[in-house]
Curated annotation (Swiss-Prot):
Entry keyword annotation includes Nucleotidyltransferase: no
Keywords: ATP-binding, Cell membrane, Membrane, Nucleotide-binding, Translocase, Transport
Protein name: Putative ABC transporter ATP-binding protein CA_C1368
Record-listed ATP binding positions: G37, P38, N39, G40, A41, G42, K43, S44
PANTHER family tied to this protein: ENERGY-COUPLING FACTOR TRANSPORTER ATP-BINDING PROTEIN ECFA1, HEAVY METAL TRANSPORTER
Family in the record: Belongs to the ABC transporter superfamily.
Subcellular localization: Cell membrane
CDD domains per UniProt: ABC_cobalt_CbiO_domain1
Pfam families (UniProt xref): ABC_tran
Taxonomic source organism: Clostridium acetobutylicum (strain ATCC 824 / DSM 792 / JCM 1419 / IAM 19013 / LMG 5710 / NBRC 13948 / NRRL B-527 / VKM B-1787 / 2291 / W)
Role this protein plays: Probably part of an ABC transporter complex. Responsible for energy coupling to the transport system.
EC assignment: 7.-.-.-
MF terms in GO: ATP binding; ATP hydrolysis activity; ATPase-coupled transmembrane transporter activity
Lineage: Bacteria, Bacillati, Bacillota, Clostridia, Eubacteriales
Length: 279
């Protein structure tokens, strides 16, 4: 059974704007799935359906077989699907890190002992031990992102949904966050669904990609399969990973002929070593 099933979903806002049209997606437990598309493609609307913030106008969204339209399912769905917003300041509103991470647990009515244990565990996972008494609002952008993530992890979700997780992070912060998310996925078997405009992190992290444009699903498949549809991506103002673009230039200049398009530094380095007999 798919962990997330999205079947024939449409969503129409009250003003008549159709944000999503006939969307179908299947996501299995433990997958890392990138949702790509230009601004206004429908990504945020889709994400808001995954834990029942909004319901489809037609079609269905199911999490572990539970329909998000059924009100009695929502407590379980919202426990199982953790949302991390694009702007951490939209998610952090308590006066201390401890209170921030404990907030959802208090609402779940877990015991004090369990609460303390989960807060400590979540901070350890995101490498923020010792920050319990600090104010979230005085932290750096990268630290805020980790605290927001910890507050969701403390709920022990089965799925993490991240809206533009690397936005506003510097290159070092981006790499650290990607490594952390990969560790969470691999060690805890948590499914991760994320949107991004940073094409360079997609081949480093995702194993499946869906591409939306104007509310419609226009591409889906493995990372290489999707990025090989270069014309489609460029027509909706999405770029290739920079390494892939460099490979295109080298090929068009007659410098190197690649058997398949490299997407990461590691892949292009391997191609060049194979062609040149090692460097």
């Amino acid at each position: 059974m798919n962990q997330i099933s999205i079947n024939n979903v449409d969503y129409i806002y009250s003003d008549g704007f159709e944000a999503l049209h006939d969307i179908n997606m299947s996501i299995k437990k433990g997958e890392r799935v990138a949702i790509l598309g230009p601004n206004g493609a429908g990504k945020s609307t889709l994400f808001n359906m995954l834990n029942g913030i909004i319901s489809p106008t037609s079609g269905e969204v199911k999490i572990n077989g539970l329909d998000t339209k059924v009100k009695k399912n929502l407590n379980v769905i919202r426990r199982d699907v953790g949302m991390v917003f694009q702007d951490s300041d939209d998610q952090l509103f308590n006066s201390s890190v401890m209170q921030e991470i404990a907030y959802g647990l208090v609402n779940m009515k877990v015991s004090e002992e369990e609460l303390q244990s989960r807060v400590k565990w979540a901070l350890n996972v995101v490498n923020m031990d010792g920050f319990e008494k600090k104010s979230p609002h005085n932290l750096s952008g990268g630290q805020k992102k980790r605290i927001a993530l910890a507050s969701v992890l403390a709920m022990k979700p089965e799925v993490l949904v991240l809206d533009e997780p690397t936005v506003s992070l510097d290159p070092r912060g981006t790499i650290k966050l990607v490594k952390l998310l990969k560790k969470i996925n691999e060690e805890m078997k948590i499914t991760i669904v994320f949107s991004t405009h940073d094409m360079d992190i997609v081949p480093l992290f995702a194993d499946k990609v869906y591409v939306l444009n104007e509310g419609k699903l226009i591409l889906q498949g493995g990372v290489k399969e999707v990025f090989n549809n270069k014309k489609v991506l460029r027509n909706i103002n999405l770029r290739l990973p920079r390494v892939a673009h460099l490979a295109e230039i080298l090929k068009s200049d007659g410098c190197i002929e690649f058997d398949e398009l490299p997407l990461t530094i590691g892949e292009i380095r391997k191609c060049i070593k194979n062609l040149k007999g090692g460097i």
